[in-house]
C-alpha cells in the first residue's frame, strides 16, 4: 500500500464523507505545481476554487505570514491590532468603498452581507419589520451555512436541513422579466454571482449586470455582488462586475483575498450600509486578525503588482480559443471569462477529470457535466500549452 493510499484510508475512516475528492494526496506545492507523497508532479488547474490565484506558496505572501507570526497572531476584536487599519484602507481603496467588515470564510461574509441588507431594509429603506426579501438566482452557490442553503435552488443542498429560512425569492439567472416580476416593496437586495461558478461557469448575458444596477437604483434595492470566486482577477478583470462597467452597493470577497495561505473574507460597502451595525450587533473572534491582515495585504499587493487580472484576461482568451478548437462529440460548449473556463459535456465530466489526473493535470467537475478550469493566475503560456496537450489527449 502506498503512502497516499494509507492517507486516503485514514481520512475516509475518521472523516465525515461530505466530499468526494479525486484519489490524490497533495503533500507539496509551489506555483502551479503540486506533488503527492510518492513524488509524482501534477499541474493544479483548480486553484482551490480560486483561493490560490497568486499561486501556491507565493514567496511574498509566505514571507508576510512568517514575519507576522513572529510578532502577534490573534488579539480578537476586543483590542486594536497594528495592521488592521492598514488592511482596511487598502481593501476599501481597492474596491472604492467607505468601509470593510472582515470575516474568515466566504459563507460567513455572505451571512454578514445578508444581515446588513436586512437591517438596512428596516433602518434605512423603511420596510415593515420581518418583511424584507432578498432575490437570488437559480444555480447560485453562496456557501453551506443556513442562509445560503435556504436560498439555494439545489434540492440536495437543502435535503434534511429544514425548516429553511424565509425571505428569499429565486429567479432564473439572466432572465430580466423574471427579475422584474420578483421585485416588490419589500425587496431589500439582489444577491448575484457575476459569473456562476458551481453552476458550471455560467456567464450572464451582456448587459445583465447593468440591468440589475438600474433596477436597484430605480427601486432603492441593494446590489450585492458575491465576488468570492470570480473576483480578484479570476475573470480577467479585478472584479467580475467590471465586465458590465457597474459597481455594486456591496462586494463580498474571500478565497484569493488570503493568497491561498490564510482564510479571510470581507464585506465592503459605503457608510449607509455598514453603519447599520452597532457594537455587539455582529462580530467574529478571528475576523481581521493580525495574521490574516498581514497575509491579505501581501495577497492584494501581488494581485496588483503582478497584474494578475491582465494576465488572466490575456491567457484566458488564448486558453478558451484553443479549447474551442477541440472537436469531440461529447463537448457541448466551452465558456467563461479570463482563466475561469468550463467545458460543458453531454455526459458526466467526472471520468474526464479522472483521466486528466492520470495525465498529471488536476481539475474538478462541477454541476456533474462541466469540467472547470481555474489555474493559478501566475501560470505561463508554456504551462497552459502543456495543459492543452493533456486535455486534447483525453478527448482524442
UniProtKB/Swiss-Prot annotation:
CDD domains (UniProt xref): OAT_like
Record's keyword annotation contains Transmembrane: no
The protein's annotated pathway: Amino-acid biosynthesis; L-proline biosynthesis; L-glutamate 5-semialdehyde from L-ornithine: step 1/1
Pfam families cross-referenced by the UniProt entry: Aminotran_3
Catalysed transformations (reactions): a 2-oxocarboxylate + L-ornithine = L-glutamate 5-semialdehyde + an L-alpha-amino acid
First-tier enzyme category under EC: transferase
Residues with the N6-(pyridoxal phosphate)lysine modification: 255
Annotated localization: Cytoplasm
Enzyme Commission numbers on file: 2.6.1.13
InterPro entries xref list: Aminotrans_3, Aminotrans_3_PPA_site, Class-III_PLP-dep_AT, Orn_aminotrans, Ornith_aminotrans_bact, PyrdxlP-dep_Trfase, PyrdxlP-dep_Trfase_major, PyrdxlP-dep_Trfase_small
Family to which this protein belongs: Belongs to the class-III pyridoxal-phosphate-dependent aminotransferase family. OAT subfamily.
Function: Catalyzes the interconversion of ornithine to glutamate semialdehyde.
Protein name (record): Ornithine aminotransferase
Origin species: Staphylococcus epidermidis (strain ATCC 35984 / DSM 28319 / BCRC 17069 / CCUG 31568 / BM 3577 / RP62A)
Amino acid at each position: 500500500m502506498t503512502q497516499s493510499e494509507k492517507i486516503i484510508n485514514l481520512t475516509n475512516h475518521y472523516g465525515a464523507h461530505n466530499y468526494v475528492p479525486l484519489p490524490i494526496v497533495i503533500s507539496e506545492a509551489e506555483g502551479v505545481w503540486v506533488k503527492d507523497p510518492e513524488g509524482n508532479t501534477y499541474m493544479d488547474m483548480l486553484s482551490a476554487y480560486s483561493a490560490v490565484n497568486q499561486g501556491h506558496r507565493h514567496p511574498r505572501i509566505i514571507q508576510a505570514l512568517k514575519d507576522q507570526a513572529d510578532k502577534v497572531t490573534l488579539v480578537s476584536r476586543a483590542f486594536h491590532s497594528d495592521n488592521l487599519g492598514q488592511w482596511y484602507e487598502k481593501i476599501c481603496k481597492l474596491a472604492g468603498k467607505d468601509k470593510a467588515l472582515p470575516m474568515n470564510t466566504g459563507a460567513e461574509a455572505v451571512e454578514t452581507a445578508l444581515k446588513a441588507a436586512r437591517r438596512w431594509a428596516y433602518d434605512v429603506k423603511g420596510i415593515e419589520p420581518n418583511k424584507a426579501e432578498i432575490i437570488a438566482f437559480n444555480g447560485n452557490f453562496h456557501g453551506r451555512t443556513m442562509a445560503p442553503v435556504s436560498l439555494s435552488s439545489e434540492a440536495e443542498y437543502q435535503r434534511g436541513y429544514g425548516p429553511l429560512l424565509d425571505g428569499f425569492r429565486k429567479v432564473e439567472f439572466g432572465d430580466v422579466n423574471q427579475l422584474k416580476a420578483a421585485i416588490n416593496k419589500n425587496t431589500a437586495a439582489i444577491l448575484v454571482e457575476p459569473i456562476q461558478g458551481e453552476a458550471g461557469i455560467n456567464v450572464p448575458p451582456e448587459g445583465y449586470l447593468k440591468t440589475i444596477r438600474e433596477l436597484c437604483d430605480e427601486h432603492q434595492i441593494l446590489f450585492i455582488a458575491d465576488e468570492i470566486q470570480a473576483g480578484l482577477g479570476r475573470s480577467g478583470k479585478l472584479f467580475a462586475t467590471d465586465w458590465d462597467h457597474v459597481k455594486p452597493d456591496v462586494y463580498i470577497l474571500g478565497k484569493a483575498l488570503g493568497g491561498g495561505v490564510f482564510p479571510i473574507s470581507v464585506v465592503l460597502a459605503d457608510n449607509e450600509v455598514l453603519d447599520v451595525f452597532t457594537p455587539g450587533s455582529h462580530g467574529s473572534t478571528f475576523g481581521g486578525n493580525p495574521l490574516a491582515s498581514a497575509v491579505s495585504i501581501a495577497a492584494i499587493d501581488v494581485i496588483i503588482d503582478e497584474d494578475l487580472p491582465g494576465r488572466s484576461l490575456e491567457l484566458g482568451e488564448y486558453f478558451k480559443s484553443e479549447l474551442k478548437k477541440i472537436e469531440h462529440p461529447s463537448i457541448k460548449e466551452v465558456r467563461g471569462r479570463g482563466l475561469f473556463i468550463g467545458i460543458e459535456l453531454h455526459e458526466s465530466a467526472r471520468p474526464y477529470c479522472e483521466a486528466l489526473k492520470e495525465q498529471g493535470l488536476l481539475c474538478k467537475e462541477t454541476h456533474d457535466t462541466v469540467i472547470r478550469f481555474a489555474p493559478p493566475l501566475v501560470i505561463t503560456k508554456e504551462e497552459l500549452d502543456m495543459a492543452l496537450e493533456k486535455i486534447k489527449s483525453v478527448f482524442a
